[in-house]
């Protein structure tokens, strides 16, 4: 009896976390609780926005768990931010600010390959590059700068010179485009000029001067009038010759119709009389004779060739 009391007073043995029952029930292990307590101060620091994770080496948890904390961030932030293996700090609200790339670009150089995250981000301006450009601009002499700016000005001067030449040439061309003034002659002047032209087609200089003085005209006006009148006279002669040629061609095209004799009741008497009386020459003749078949006279030609 006392032995049984001692056995009942002993507490039951604790179950091992690696037993089959604990594994099947999938209960959270008690060993994880210290890990949660480790992250509790970080949560409070994030809410207060006063703690940064820049000195990651001072923390006790391993570095491999940092990506898990980073993967808890929003997806759109992960796309914009650079690669996660660089050192970063947590700002207010739990977001990690993007690390500046100029230091890395200095180390890698301009031709080094860049990761996919950095290709999307714009390339920062290198301060040394800006200084080199400033030195290059300062190293240029003022004469070179003036020469570079003077090239377009010389081209403008050339263009302006061409425009000036065109303006000078334009007044000379304007009188040629003006309409010529036409002289109006009176009836008496036209009659005197026509009578002189009928007598003489061409005038000498003295005759032209005397005619211009008598008609109160200039010698140039008389000269131009005679030139125009001679051109008109030549056109009239050409028209008359063309009309004569047309009339001659029309006369040659006249169709010659032969004279036909109709037979009547006294055909026999007419045939006999025709044999005795010579046939008069017709008005219209043909090169070939025309024969008419007759029962009495079979070979008597009615029309003779010329």
From Swiss-Prot:
Coiled coil: none annotated. GO terms for biological process: cell differentiation; nervous system development. The keyword Oxidoreductase does not apply. Belongs to the HMX homeobox family. It comes from Xenopus tropicalis. The lineage of its organism: Eukaryota, Metazoa, Chordata, Craniata, Vertebrata. Keywords: Developmental protein, Differentiation, DNA-binding, Homeobox, Neurogenesis, Nucleus, Transcription, Transcription regulation. SMART domains: HOX. One of its GO terms (cellular component) is nucleus. Residues 95-181 are annotated as: Disordered. It is found in: Nucleus. Transcription factor involved in specification of neuronal cell types and which is required for inner ear and hypothalamus development. Binds to the 5'-CAAGTG-3' core sequence. May act as a stage-specific inhibitor of anf1 in the anterior neural plate during the development. This is Homeobox protein HMX3. One of its GO terms (molecular function) is DNA binding. Residues 117-143, 153-174 have a biased composition (Basic and acidic residues). Residues 178-237 bind DNA.
């Amino acid at each position: 009896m006392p032995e049984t009391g001692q056995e009942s007073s002993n507490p039951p043995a604790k179950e091992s976390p690696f037993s089959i029952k604990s594994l099947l029930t999938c209960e959270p292990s008690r060993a994880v609780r210290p890990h949660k307590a480790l992250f509790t101060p970080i949560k409070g620091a994030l809410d207060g926005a006063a703690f940064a994770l820049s000195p990651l080496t001072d923390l006790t948890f391993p570095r491999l768990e940092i990506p898990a904390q980073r993967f808890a961030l929003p997806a759109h932030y992960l796309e914009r931010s650079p690669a996660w293996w660089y050192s970063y700090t947590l700002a207010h609200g739990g977001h990690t600010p993007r690390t500046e790339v100029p230091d890395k670009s200095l180390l890698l150089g301009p031709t080094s390959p860049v990761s996919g995250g950095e290709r999307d981000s714009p390339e920062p301006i290198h301060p040394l590059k800006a200084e080199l450009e400033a030195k290059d601009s300062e190293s240029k002499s003022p004469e070179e700068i003036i020469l570079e700016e003077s090239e377009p000005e010389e081209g403008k001067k050339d263009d302006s010179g061409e425009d000036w030449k065109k303006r000078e040439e334009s007044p000379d061309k304007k009188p040629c485009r003006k309409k010529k003034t036409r002289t109006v002659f009176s009836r008496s002047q036209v009659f005197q000029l026509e009578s002189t032209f009928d007598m003489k087609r061409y005038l000498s200089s003295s005759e032209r001067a005397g005619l211009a003085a008598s008609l109160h005209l200039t010698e140039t006006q008389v000269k131009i009038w005679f030139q125009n009148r001679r051109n008109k006279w030549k056109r009239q002669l050409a028209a008359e010759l063309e009309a004569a040629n047309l009339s001659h061609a029309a006369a040659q095209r006249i169709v010659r119709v032969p004279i036909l004799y109709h037979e009547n009741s006294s055909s026999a008497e007419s045939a006999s009389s025709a044999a005795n009386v010579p046939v008069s020459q017709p008005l219209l003749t043909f090169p070939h004779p025309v024969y008419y078949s007759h029962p009495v006279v079979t070979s008597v030609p009615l029309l003779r060739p010329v």
